[in-house]
């Protein structure tokens, strides 16, 4: 299911929400209406949490069905709250805290920014239980902000090179396409939230953009 919605007037959904096929980490002050739409569209358990005392869960965490890697500034109580809900979360040993902006992942693999250290790459691979490859996307280091990936497909920044697209397809084990959201915005990961069940995008996303998103993320099959 694909839905157009803003979070308290903000279309940058991927900055605030980190999602897998089973769980969504959303800000503690998320309105009930938005929470209901997310729960229905993505078919997930919703956890209202903070990371590093912040509402920027999408920027500060990346996960798949095996767990989440979070900012090294995440607090013990936040890690414990996730553990109590049955969600493993491990801090990344890295000075760059916005791990959600730097990693594109699904249950098959992870593509990580060249900015990340070998130790960070090891933790990502161990926690998510996937192979990790290093690449830019659209020539930029913020791989997670430049794309959205699920176990069904990936939507990438239109400036992605054929080499970058090939790396992402090989690593994540899905077909990828390029497109935009929110009427021409190329920061796909920062402006959308997607899993294998559905996708949320900002209210300004156009009809042609929706069609491309549905196709790229595998919602037009069969």
From Swiss-Prot:
Pfam families: eIF-6
Protein's GO biological process: cytosolic ribosome assembly
Organism: Methanothermobacter thermautotrophicus (strain ATCC 29096 / DSM 1053 / JCM 10044 / NBRC 100330 / Delta H)
Family stated for the protein in its record: Belongs to the eIF-6 family.
Function statement: Binds to the 50S ribosomal subunit and prevents its association with the 30S ribosomal subunit to form the 70S initiation complex.
Record-linked InterPro entries: eIF6
Protein name: Translation initiation factor 6
GO molecular function ontology, one term from the record: ribosome binding
């Amino acid at each position: 299911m694909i839905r157009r919605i803003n979070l308290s007037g903000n279309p940058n959904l991927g900055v605030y929400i980190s999602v897998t096929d089973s769980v969504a980490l959303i800000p503690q002050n998320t309105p009930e209406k938005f929470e209901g739409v997310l729960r229905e569209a993505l078919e997930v358990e919703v956890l209202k949490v903070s990371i590093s005392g912040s509402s920027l869960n999408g920027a500060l965490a990346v996960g798949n069905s095996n767990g989440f890697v979070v900012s090294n500034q995440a607090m013990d109580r936040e890690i414990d709250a996730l553990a109590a809900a049955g969600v493993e979360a491990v801090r990344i040993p890295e000075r760059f805290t916005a791990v959600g902006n730097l990693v594109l992942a699904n249950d098959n693999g992870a593509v990580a920014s060249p900015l990340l250290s070998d130790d960070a790459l090891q933790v990502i691979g161990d926690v998510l239980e996937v192979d990790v490859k290093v690449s830019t996307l659209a020539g930029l280091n913020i791989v997670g902000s430049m794309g959205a990936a699920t176990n069904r497909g990936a939507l990438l920044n239109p400036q992605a090179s054929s080499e970058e697209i090939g790396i992402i397809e090989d690593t994540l084990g899905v077909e990828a396409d390029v497109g935009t959201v929110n009427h021409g915005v190329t920061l796909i990961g920062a402006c959308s939230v997607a899993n294998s069940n559905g996708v949320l995008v900002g209210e300004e996303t156009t009809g042609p953009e929706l069609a491309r998103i549905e196709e790229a993320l595998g919602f037009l099959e069969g």
